[in-house]
Amino acid sequence: MKLKPTTEKTLIDCLAITLAIFIPYHQVAQHTFTDYDDNGYLFQNNHINIGLTWDNIGWAFTTTEMANWHPLTWISHLIDRELFGIHPGGYLLMNVAWHMLAACLAYLAFLHCTKSRLFALTVALIFALHPVNVENVAWASERKSILNAVFWFAALISYLRFIETKSFKAYGLTVIFFILSLFSKAMSVTLPCTLMLIHCLYFVYHPDQRRLPERLRQEWKSIILPACSLLILSLYFSVVTMSAQSIAMNENIDLSDRVINALISYQRYLGMFFHPTQLALFYPLRSENPLLWGSTVPALLLLFALSVVALLLARKKPQLVIGWAWFLGTMVPVIGLVQVGGQSHADRYLYIPLLGLAFVFPVLFEMLGSLGVWFKKSLISFSLMILAVSMLAATQIQVSYWQDGVSICRHSLAVTGYCFNPVVSLSITYTRTGRFDELFAMLDSYIALEDNPWNKGILATIKANVLYTMGRHQAAADSVQKALSWGFTNKVSYALAALSFYELGQTNQAILYLAKAKVAPELQMQNSLLAFPLREKLTWLDLRLEEKITPKPNL
């Protein structure tokens, strides 16, 4: 059966997008897991290691492990466990496959919306190949972002169908896909607002006899009301997410610092989109840095200026103001006003928002097409090819940094300088792989650089725990005492001190630290290097010390 020309072109474009993704991302088949979240999500997660069972499906819908509620993401990991066992390449190739599907759905959504092959292909290729999206694909733990995008674009397609047909079935599918996206990652709470924007973009490319402003005024109810009913779901899932993430929320950051960081982060995201170099795993939030205050005014002026430009061009190029609103709005859940963790911003957060910024490129290409020159089609094709090839080359390099936990953490530290989180992740990897000389050299150098006493204590306690397991009890005792002197006082540090002194035969010191360990607070952090079986260790030490101090009867 011969396909229609439009269908043939659509298939060709989707195949081109898929192939373009495969070229830089095929290397992940040889990559390994990292010790930054992959351990908690995958290879050290007891439920995932059991595989797909009814009990684990129930667990997926009730757990808030990893400070998130995303049951569909957990189920996808369980399925991968059944398919690939513990082979990292399988999980990562599935990420690539999901990313291919998301990019093709993005192409179909924008093709449906704009009827412009140029617009759809340009935006989809930017989404598919932009190096800032590598983190979402080459990091097994970020499956949630890709799944969310797949159902996000499916919701856009069904909603566009609803715009055209007013079909209850199409609207019902939109609701279902929206719920599935929320089950994957709660960042999609902004989808209802995005549906309003996609409705406006649809009007731009499907004009009638009315001017666009007049049409928007007359049909505002048809734009707002269908999306508003979905906002109820957004509100509910926002509450669920806030509850799940409460354990990871950073309440020590003042609201003023969070607002400042949010403004500066918008500026940084713009820079990451248009000049994606020096990308890192973790960008530390340094609220005490006085330079942040100096950067606030330029960031605010930039956002204001770009907003004014977009509004001034709204009559001639409404795509620009729609794209700008897409970017600003979809960033809100992750911009840092509610601070979760210690990062100032993250590559992975730009996965959906960058689509709004991508609108500028098809607009530029359309302007090239309006030039009265005979080679304008060749000029557009050449420009699009240059854009795609440059992104592909940058992505190829960025993917290579993710070959293992050591590679990505070292690269991240090279970009940002000393940063606590990658150092801890690297410590876990070095310990798990027996690279102790590198571990101790790294910890000694970074303990000297760390300004935060609590973080210094964590690094010193990590070192002490590894030394203790190696049988180097004196060095372990020295290291954990440094941690205690820096204020890192909790059950873990006191127990480690007690165990080390017991092995050294210093019973009085062991008794002293054991008594403190029994009443000290629990350590509220997930770290495999600080998560030894405390209760069993303390009970064992209690019995050993009791044997030592109980006098033997005279015979």
Predicted features and spans:
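C-terminal luminal/periplasmic domains and tails of membrane-associated envelope-modifying transferases
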Residues: 2-3, 406-555
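Polytopic membrane enzymes that build or remodel cell-surface glycoconjugates and lipids
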Residues: 1-437, 450-458, 469, 503
